[in-house]
Each structure stands twice: as structure tokens, then as C-alpha cells.
């Protein structure tokens, strides 16, 4: 590898010779969202993605005739027909064509329902769950006492923040159509 290394930078030309960069380029070329109208979201930071997903839910629900308003506090994202709604979106994970992971689910926060977006390359599916269903299905321990959906701090301590995985082919049985939890 013939590059000019300095202590403060790698040039745009030099990065092209790094194995890590080559792997990243290949993964980018193989992204299942390439050419999809949803590709733009795949390229966003998590924070920006979350804000855009909230906007999508707001516009979608408004178009369906729901009354969407600002939240009462930072524990939920919107109020839809007076219901406090937390919004969580997931795109298929790189290299795993059927894997969704919704993150930062906190049953102790002030919301009534969670709206889950499952963003496929050609469609967005909207699901919902009550706060109680989230708690009952995520705030659980296995037979060894491990918090199996715990997002932070390992499996031994309940961090209060959970994740949910789905293979994308079988959405969790406790999910309901979004309209059902908003009525």
C-alpha cells in the first residue's frame, strides 16, 4: 500500500486503499435499499431517522383523518386523537434481509401506545402495541434471571431500556394494526 501517512489525516485518495473502506464500499453497493425511495433514511443518523419517522407517522395519521398534536412532554413523541404515542422505526439491518430491531423502548416512560414502523425497501408497515404489551413482552427474564431484551448494562440488571428483534417475516404476535391501538 502506497499512501502518505501523516499524524493528523488520511486523504480522500488514500482511504481508497484501506481494507476497511473497501469492505464498507462493497456493503454499500449490496444495500437492499439501493434504488428504493426509502434509501435516504438508511443513510441518516439514528437521531435524524427518528425525527423523520415521527414526521412520517404524523403525516400518515393526519392523512387518515386522525388529530395529531405535539406531545405533553419528552416521554412520548406525539398525541394522536388524545393518545400519547411513542414512535419507533426500524429498517432491515445490513446483511440481514429479514431482521428488524426496534430500540430504546422504555416501559416506565409516559406514553399509552407505541407505533412501530417496519421499513422494507418497497413499503412501510405500521403496527402498534399498548404500553402494557410492551412491558409484558420486553421487561422479562429468562429461566437464568437474564433480562433478555435489556439494551444497556448487560443481562443481569434491568436498565429500563429494551430492544425488540423481529425476523421481518413474522411480526411479533402481540403487535396489532396501528389503527387498532389508536381507536
Give the role of each language-model region:
Residues 1-81, 88-183:
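Nucleic-acid endonuclease domains
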Amino acid at each position: 500500500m502506497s499512501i502518505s501517512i501523516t499524524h493528523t489525516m488520511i486523504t480522500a485518495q488514500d482511504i481508497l486503499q484501506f481494507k476497511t473502506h473497501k469492505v464498507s464500499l462493497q456493503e454499500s453497493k449490496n444495500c437492499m435499499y439501493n434504488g428504493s425511495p426509502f434509501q435516504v433514511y438508511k443513510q441518516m443518523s439514528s437521531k435524524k431517522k427518528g425525527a423523520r419517522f415521527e414526521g412520517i407517522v404524523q403525516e400518515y395519521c393526519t392523512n387518515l383523518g386522525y388529530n395529531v398534536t405535539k406531545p405533553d412532554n419528552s416521554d412520548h413523541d406525539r398525541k394522536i386523537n388524545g393518545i400519547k404515542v411513542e414512535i419507533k422505526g426500524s429498517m432491515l439491518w445490513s446483511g440481514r434481509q429479514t431482521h428488524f430491531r426496534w430500540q430504546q423502548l422504555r416501559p416506565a416512560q409516559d406514553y399509552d401506545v407505541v407505533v412501530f414502523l417496519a421499513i422494507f425497501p418497497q413499503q412501510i408497515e405500521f403496527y402498534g402495541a399498548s404500553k402494557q404489551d410492551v412491558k409484558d413482552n420486553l421487561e422479562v427474564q429468562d429461566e437464568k434471571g437474564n433480562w433478555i431484551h435489556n439494551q444497556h448494562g448487560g443481562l443481569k440488571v434491568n436498565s429500563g431500556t429494551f430492544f425488540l428483534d423481529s425476523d421481518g417475516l413474522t411480526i411479533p404476535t402481540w403487535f396489532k394494526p396501528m389503527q387498532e391501538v389508536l381507536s
